[in-house]
Amino acid sequence: MIKLFASDMDGTLLNPNHVISDTTAQAIRDLQAQSDIEFLIATGRDYRSAKWLLDQHQLTARIIAVNGAATYDVKGNLEDVFALDLADTQTLIERFATPGTQTLVSLKSLNGYYVNDLSLYRRRMEAFLNRAKEAASDDSL
């Protein structure tokens, strides 16, 4: 017997427009109506982003966020955190941010993101998006 239905969001629960469709929302409600099956979200997104998407359809679920670093109950209470401590985080930043190179350090926390070089981040994101646009418009693919 199924006791739990867990779903990722991006590329799974969300449609190509990156939202939960009305049909999917109704399927979740139907699943949740079966009191013996728990529905939860497991995502790389932070809690607020995942919760906002659920709120668009008045859905509730436990959420495993930030690639498993935090778990939240249905009411949004933080249950567990599995995070690097500050000293380990600083060590990682120092190791990867090599002087004289264009090393980009990007860290996700429960409350947002840290980027060591915002200008470099923007340039790399623009280059990535331009490559994606070119690939999307390439008729030979």
Residue ranges and their predicted role:
Residues 2, 36, 60, 100-102:
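A general structural motif
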Residues 3-18:
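Asp-based phosphoryl-transfer active-site loop
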Residues 17-33:
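Basic, amphipathic juxtamembrane/active-site segments
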Residues 28-51, 67, 105-109:
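Substrate-recognition element of Asp-dependent hydrolases with the DxDx(T/V) motif
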Residues 52-60, 118-122:
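Glycine-rich loop at the start of a catalytic domain that most often binds anionic cofactors/ligands
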Residues 69-141:
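HAD-like small-molecule phosphatases
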